[in-house]
């Protein structure tokens, strides 16, 4: 069976937390008359997922999902991270250890169904990997230098070697990003800068195991939860997408941009 076929029964989980510092009630932000988290679920439903479930921390999110026919489960409001919320949802849904789960962020209303499918397919195709995620080529030096743009370096097997907010890989003898002029020309094989895309796949057993792992020093330093997996010796397979995904929503300005794109 091919990796794509083997991933057809996966579950998409969308963690949704009502509180947001920069955009109050973000999951419920109106986009063309539809709450944002519902938009995300509708996009995910166009993938090959067997089911799409919102893991919500507030009754208002549950009510919004119910009003639009989206399955949702209530999770505790005091989870320290989205991964902890997913672990609780996996237990509530009774997922088997080997069931594939794709974590789609609740602020990605333009997430491409094909990207979800590709990340889900990583685990059946790469049984040595505990997680899957995605990245795309960086083409602008300002993105390479931006600490809000997370970079990932891969090894020869296409597994994540490290994630960082710093501009990696770094060329010795050059200041910051001066070695790289954008694009692929003149870049040694395997060294082209890649931007990490915040979507993950796991087997349900690993979701629960990950939530129980102690945080890693690098995770705290960089504020990147995925570094916990690497620190503890787990492998993360990476799908390199052909293009950047649609914009996510972190701020009111982001919301207006997405509203304009969706008409």
UniProtKB/Swiss-Prot annotation:
GO molecular function: 3-deoxy-manno-octulosonate cytidylyltransferase activity
Domain of life, per lineage: Bacteria
GO CC terms, sorted: cytosol
Pathway(s) served: Nucleotide-sugar biosynthesis; CMP-3-deoxy-D-manno-octulosonate biosynthesis; CMP-3-deoxy-D-manno-octulosonate from 3-deoxy-D-manno-octulosonate and CTP: step 1/1; Bacterial outer membrane biogenesis; lipopolysaccharide biosynthesis
HAMAP family assigned: KdsB
PANTHER family: 3-DEOXY-MANNO-OCTULOSONATE CYTIDYLYLTRANSFERASE, 3-DEOXY-MANNO-OCTULOSONATE CYTIDYLYLTRANSFERASE, MITOCHONDRIAL
Protein name (database record): 3-deoxy-manno-octulosonate cytidylyltransferase
Organism: Paracidovorax citrulli (strain AAC00-1) (Acidovorax citrulli)
